[in-house]
Amino acid sequence: MKLLRVGTAGAERPALLDAEGVLRDLTGIVDDIDGALLADAAALGRVRAAADAGELPALDATGLRIGPPLARIGKVVCIGLNYHDHARETGAEPPAEPVVFFKAADTVVGPNDTVLVPRGSVKTDWEVELAVVIGRTARYVADDEDPLAYVAGYAVAHDVSEREFQIERGGTWDKGKNCETFNPLGPWLVTADEVADPQDLSLKLWVNGELKQDGTTAEQIFSVAEVVRYVSQFMVLYPGDVINTGTPAGVALGAPEPKPFLRAGDVVELEIAGLGRQRQEFKDA
């Protein structure tokens, strides 16, 4: 299923995109798309049954904003330097263990919402990423368990980053990762049963129509399964938590000088095969 939330910011309603591309209203069946729903197999079953039976009313998508596909996100865990080609382009050694950091849940916005270039920024950068959405509480996932059994679904994430704040201003990466609007998510949450292999997904990103990133999750240093298992050894992952699993080569940071960092007026488009497409205009904060 493709689950999404539509409407004005803060007042989104749950919806489903059916196999014919028709937007369907879920408000008569569920209150919202959130961790509680993803953890409730019976509720998800009712959604699927209603969709299969053609019982869901259609919504007019004309002019309708798409919000983040998930409400009340608990935490956004991020994995840095998780693609072989991205590590090569930045001159970094592939890490021996996953590089873990966080983005605040309030950085999450809709897939087509405006992204704000922070005041004083001269090095705002792009990163297309596969987002993993947790559907079951994952705590110390064992070696003999399948970590993907804890995954509810997948989405497109844009891990927007300010490199000067992140790298040059001291401390941890947090300052360059948590600026407002720095995590567009969606358009949909695609349930895990519709993603045959999360290690076989193409990712692309364009800036002002020019292709900048063209990668595949097959290049990940640590697979989705390895990431879920690893992170669960250090923190509990709850339904509705999100893991951004890293970006492939092609970011501005890895480009020759002068590096083409983002400015107000730029337009970024990104997509992951089967998971949908985003488009953001960048404006000054």
Where are these regions (language model features)?
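Catalytic-pocket segment enriched in acidic/His residues
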Residues: 5-10, 48, 57-60, 64, ...
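Structural signature of FAD isoalloxazine-binding scaffolds in flavoprotein oxidoreductases
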Residues: 94-111, 124-126, 262-274
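RNA pseudouridine synthases
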Residues: 134, 142-157
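N-terminal non-catalytic cap/leader segment that marks the start of a structured domain
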Residues: 1-98, 204, 267-269
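Short, structured patches in soluble enzyme cores that scaffold and shape functional sites
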Residues: 103-105, 112, 119, 126-130, ...
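A generic local secondary-structure boundary/capping motif
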Residues: 4, 66-68, 88-91, 115-124, ...
